[in-house]
Amino acid sequence: MAPQLLLCLIQTFLWSLPEAESNVFLKSNVANRFLQRTKRANSGFEEIYPANFERECVEERCSKEEAREVFEDDEKTEAFWTVYVDGDQCLSNPCHYGGTCKDGIGSYTCTCLAGYEGKNCEHDLLKSCRVDNGNCWHFCKPVQNDTQCSCAEGYRLGDNGFSCIAEGEFSCGRNIKSRNKREASLPDFQTDFSDDYDAIDENNLIETVQSQSATLLKKSDNPNPDIRIVNGLDCKLGECPWQAVLIDEKGTAFGGGTILSPYFVLTAAHCINKTKSIAVVVGQVDISRKETRRLLSVDKVYTHPKYVHVTNDYDIAIIQLKTPIQFSENVVPACLPTADFANHVLMKQDFGIVSGFGRIEEKGPTSNILKVVMVPYVDRHTCILSTKIPITRNMFCAGYGNQPEDACEGDSGGPHITAYKDTHFLTGIVSWGEGCGRDGKYGIYTKVSNFLPWIKTIMRRKQPSTESSTGRL
C-alpha cells in the first residue's frame, strides 16, 4: 500500500512543474520590457572607430597607450595616468606655504614659492642657516624647521636670540680701538711690564721641536714657505691685536702667529724648523723698537704629526707659552669659528685680512712696521689651475692674481682673519706661495677649519708644565 501512495505523490509533483515554471519565469518578449543589458560602444568593429574614453578606460582597464590614444596629448595623458594607476597623491594637500602639488605614480612633487624649499616646501629659507647665516651674528644651527644661534667663547647670546654680546672687556675678535683714535705708540704694558712676563735672553730660549721631515730642509726646490705683505697698509696700534711675532735666538723676527688664548699662539709648522730657538712678542707694531719689547718664553711647541715639509701639507703648529699673555685694548685673541661657520659663511665672504712684518716686495727688505692687506678669497678651481704644485684639501688660495698685493717672506705663520658682524675669526695661516704678488699667482693658506678638533685638544691643556719641553701631538 505504501509504495503505491509514494508513486502517486511523485506523479502529482511532476504534473505541477510546467505550471510552476510559467508562474515564476516570464517569457523573453515580456522580460525584455523590464530588463535591458547595456552593451559596449562600437562593439564588433571598435578598432576602426576613434578612441573612446568610456570604452577604453571605464568599461575596461586601459593601458597607458590606450589612454594616449584617447587624450592625444602627452601632458594630459601623464596627468590622467598618475591618478588612474594609484590615486591622486595630492588630495591631502602635502605642499606647505602655498606650494603647488603635482601627482606622480607612488609619489608627488611640490613646486615651492620663493623663499621655501624641501620635499613639502616645509623649510622657510628665512629661518635657514643657509640664508644670511639665519640672521645669527656668530654660529647658526638648524633645529627642526627653525634655526638656533650661538656665540663664540667669551660672548653671550643677546635677548633677540641672534646677536652676540661680549662678556669681557677683551673678548676674542674685537677691535677695541676705533681707527681714528689709534695712536702709533706701543701699548702700555710694553713699557711697564708685569712680573708675570718672563723676560728672557738667548741663553734660556728653548729649543723647538724638530720635524720628522727635518732631513728635507736642505731641499731648495719646494715652494717658498717663508715667502709670504706686499703693498699693504700700516696696521695701526690695536688694529691687528691678535698678531704675534716669532723671534729667533738672534732677536730677529722670522715669522708670525695668531693669539688664540693667554697661553696659546697658532703658527705654521714650517716656521718651527727655521731656528734653533724661538720666543714670542705680542702687541707690537714696530719691531725696530727692541728696547721696548718683551719676549715671552715658550713652554712647548706642537707641530702637526702629519706635516709634510716638501708639500707644506698640514702646515700648522701651536706654541704654548710659559706665562700667560696679558690682554689689553692692543692685545686680543682672534676667535675660533666652528667648521661649518668657517666653510659656509666666513670663507664665502669677499675678503680676508692678512698681516705681518714680512718683505714689502719680492726679494726686497722686510718691514719693521706691521703691515695689513685685504685679500679676496679665490675659488678652488682657479686656485688649482694657478700652480703646478698640489693644492691639498688643507689649503686655500687668497689674493688678486693680477695685483701685487700679497703676503711675503717673513709673514709665514701669521693670521688670515675674516670679519663677520664686527667679530674677527681666524680662517687661515699664511703658508706659502710662488714669489710675492706675482701675476697669476695667489697666496696659499692653511685651512684652519680642518684642524679645529686638533687645536681644541691641545688648548685644553691650559696649565703649562713646570719644566720647558717640546712635544708633538
Curated annotation (Swiss-Prot):
Any single Pfam family the record assigns to this protein: Trypsin
Protein name: Venom prothrombin activator vestarin-D1
Cross-referenced Gene3D superfamilies: Coagulation Factor IX, Laminin, Trypsin-like serine proteases
Residue ranges constituting the Gla domain according to the UniProt record: 41-86
Keywords for the protein's UniProt record, in alphabetical order: Blood coagulation cascade activating toxin, Calcium, Cleavage on pair of basic residues, Disulfide bond, EGF-like domain, Gamma-carboxyglutamic acid, Glycoprotein, Hemostasis impairing toxin, Hydrolase, Protease, Prothrombin activator, Repeat, Secreted, Serine protease, Signal, Toxin
Disulfides per UniProt: C57-C62, C90-C101, C95-C110, C112-C121, C129-C140, C136-C149, C151-C164, C172-C335, C235-C240, C383-C397, C408-C436
Self-association state and partner proteins as the record states: Heterodimer of a light chain and a heavy chain; disulfide-linked.
Signal peptide per UniProt: 1-20
This enzyme's EC code(s): 3.4.21.6
Residues linked to a glycan: S92, N273
UniProt entry tagged with the keyword Transcription: no
Tissue specificity comment: Expressed by the venom gland.
Miscellaneous comment as given in the Swiss-Prot or TrEMBL entry: Is classified in the group D of snake venom prothrombin activators, since it requires the mammalian factor Va for maximal activity for the cleavage of prothrombin. In contrast to blood coagulation factors that circulate as inactive zymogen in plasma, venom prothrombin activators are always found in the active form in the venom.
EGF-like domain segment(s): 86-122, 129-164
Classification via InterPro entries: Coagulation_fac-like_Gla_dom, EGF-like_Ca-bd_dom, EGF-like_dom, EGF-type_Asp/Asn_hydroxyl_site, EGF_Ca-bd_CS, GLA-like_dom_SF, GLA_domain, Pept_S1A_FX
Function in brief: Snake prothrombin activator that attacks the hemostatic system of prey. This protein is functionally similar to blood coagulation factor Xa.
